[in-house]
Design a protein with these regions (language model features):
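Hydrophobic anchor at the start of a short beta-strand
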Residues: 3, 25-27, 109, 131, ...
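NAD(P)-dependent Rossmann-like dehydrogenase/reductase catalytic/cofactor-binding core
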Residues: 227-322
Length: 322
């Protein structure tokens, strides 16, 4: 399978290293320091579940990497079967020209970003018929350009067609991911799966950033606010036609609380960490989009709105100084 991974950070490095190590034809669309690192030192994926430095789970000595999408397609001898888009949401609109170069008639373009915004932005670039909304779950981070560390196992990626159809390309993508040691599946509704993640990760990031607190504080001192915020997300999703209940977890709010209770007490989200150090974050793409969705369907989201009101001025300052 010909695969292009856009980005080689925590998500892109994890996916790309595993897929390349399993024998897939993988190219990375990257820039600047990451491009230089991949070309000079390769790509290393380490499992640090038992502490650093961890052990190497995938090592790609000479990965195919370029900042030119046309060069990647030529080296791969054709447009990719699959494009895994792993950059932050802010990068998606500027990526549109590159995505159009990479996307052939049968190419699937997979989103991996947190929040509800990414699939629509990708559809604006290449059309809904190419977009496979994805839900990535892994604890990963960049130790340095070209070196990615994971904690807690190989991770997972759910994906599906925009319209829910069962297709050969989505099944082929799942097979390639499974062969690379990544748990992958096509859920009954990829949109419900996306909203399930939003109900936990975006709430954790929003309340955690507003309170400057890790999950250990949110699930104890701020448990009531956390519960109400999750309930708001579940209600918005339901108004949009997405039932977040499953056979294994019939109460999605209780399931989010169970997940919160299972996290390491010091856990934070990437959006939360960006806000904490004054960097531009995905606040609008994650929390802002969620609040707007509530407004559009007439579902009140007072806890989420309050968190957004607290954080929006900080985000404006961060972007003004960027």
């Amino acid at each position: 399978m010909r695969i292009v991974v856009i980005g080689a950070g925590g998500i892109g490095g994890w996916l790309g290293a595993r897929l390349a190590a399993s024998g897939q034809q993988v190219g990375f669309l990257v820039h600047d320091r990451t491009l230089a690192a991949l070309r000079s030192s390769g790509l290393t994926l380490c499992d640090c579940s038992r502490g650093e430095p961890g052990f190497v789970t995938a090592r790609i000595e000479m990965p195919l990497a370029s900042e030119d999408p046309q060069a990647l397609t030529e080296t791969l001898e054709g447009q990719p079967d699959l494009v895994l888009v792993t950059t932050k949401v802010d990068a998606l609109a500027p990526l549109a020209p590159a995505l159009r170069v990479l996307t052939g008639p049968g190419t699937g373009v997979v989103s991996t970003q947190n929040g509800i915004s990414a699939p629509g932005l990708l559809a604006d670039a290449v059309g809904r018929e190419h977009v496979l909304p994805g839900v990535a779950r892994v604890y990963s981070a960049v130790a340095s350009p070209g070196e990615v560390r994971t904690i807690g196992g190989a991770g997972s990626l759910a994906l599906g067609e925009w319209d829910g159809a069962a297709t050969a390309r989505s099944r082929a993508a799942v097979q390639a991911l499974e062969a690379a040691g990544i748990r992958a599946w096509i859920p009954g509704s990829i949109w419900a799966e996306l909203w399930r993640k939003v109900s936990f990760v975006v709430v954790q990031g929003a309340l955690g950033a507003a309170a400057n607190a890790p999950i250990g504080v949110l699930r104890s001192d701020l448990r009531d606010a956390f519960t109400r915020a999750v309930s708001e997300v579940v209600a918005v999703a339901a108004a949009l036609g997405h039932d977040l209940a499953t056979d294994a977890a019939p109460d999605p709010v209780a399931e989010a609380l169970r997940m919160a209770d299972a996290q390491p007490a010091g856990a934070t989200t990437s959006m939360q960490r960006d806000i904490a150090v004054g960097l531009p974050s995905e606040l609008d793409a994650q929390l802002g989009a969620l609040c707007r969705a509530g407004d559009e369907v007439g579902v009140p989201t007072p806890v989420l709105d309050l968190a957004h009101s607290v954080l929006a001025p900080r985000e404006a300052v961060a972007r003004a100084g960027a």
